[in-house]
A protein has these predicted regions:
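Non-catalytic, polymerase-adjacent accessory regions of viral genome-replication enzymes
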Residues: 1-27, 228
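N-terminal accessory alpha/beta regions
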Residues: 17-36, 46, 60
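Short, conserved non-catalytic motifs in the polymerase core
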Residues: 8-16, 41-65, 81-93, 167, ...
Length: 237
């Protein structure tokens, strides 16, 4: 998990600092997990302005290690239940795969471009900010109990609860002008969204658990007999 985390962050100041004594720090992290005293650290919060204003949280380097630990164990299990029509954050899928799938769907529905066809584009409004963290935590925990066979199952269940139920807005540094938050709707920010609601955009686990949460929607669409459909995070057709 550490090396996966370091792979794309090695030149950052936080990664360099951690690497200076990474063995001791990883042992200390392991001990806190074993003792059930692990707590998420301070996040960095900022607002991106393009293509639209959006609040983003960046977890500390050590917390990212924990996220990778979770992803390494759950992603292979999630892959076994995901629809082939889910494109984001999956090996062999992604944006280009989704675009090509849509092109092929159009070709088939239009009888090789000889007939008109129609596309219904949808998205889940305020999806990440509307997630009930307690519900998500319970769903993930039930999934782990049912499908995960590793000896570290108790550690995995514990870390998932801590990560999902964490409220990063209560311990963060803002790196954007406060005026940027005034441009956000109240349901677009964890600071004003309401207790127990919302998952921070910007963290690895947010994308992974979003796919897990919406997997039910994907299979509902397929079970309704809709052959041509696809989803990328909370946008789908």
């Amino acid at each position: 998990a550490y090396f996966d985390c370091r792979h794309s962050k090695r030149r950052t100041a936080s990664a360099v600092f951690y690497e200076m004594d990474y063995e001791s720090r990883l042992i200390a992290l392991r001990d806190r997990i074993n003792n059930r005293t692990y707590q998420t650290g301070k996040s960095v919060c900022f607002v991106v302005t393009r293509p639209r204003y959006r609040e983003v949280f960046a977890a500390s380097f050590e917390d990212r290690i924990v996220h990778h630990y979770i992803a390494l164990r759950l992603t292979p299990l999630f892959e076994e239940i995901f629809s082939e029509r889910t494109f984001n954050c999956r090996k062999g899928k992604g944006q280009l795969y989704g675009i090509n799938t849509l092109k092929e769907d159009i070709r088939q529905c239009s009888n090789n471009y000889t007939e008109d066809c129609h596309i219904m584009k949808l998205d889940l409004k305020g999806f990440f900010m509307s997630i009930d963290k307690k519900l998500l935590s319970e769903m993930v925990d039930r999934f782990i109990v049912r499908y995960y066979k590793g000896e570290d199952i108790d550690d995995l269940r514990y870390l998932c609860r801590v990560v999902i139920l964490h409220s990063p807005e209560k311990n963060c540094e803002r790196h954007s002008p406060l005026s940027y938050w005034e441009k956000l709707d109240k349901n677009k920010s964890l600071f004003t969204n309401g207790e127990g609601k919302g998952v921070a955009i910007g963290n690895l686990f947010a994308q992974i658990f979003a796919n897990f949460l919406l997997n039910t929607l994907d299979w509902f669409i397929e079970n309704e007999g809709i052959k041509h459909h696809g989803r990328y995070v909370d946008d789908f057709y």
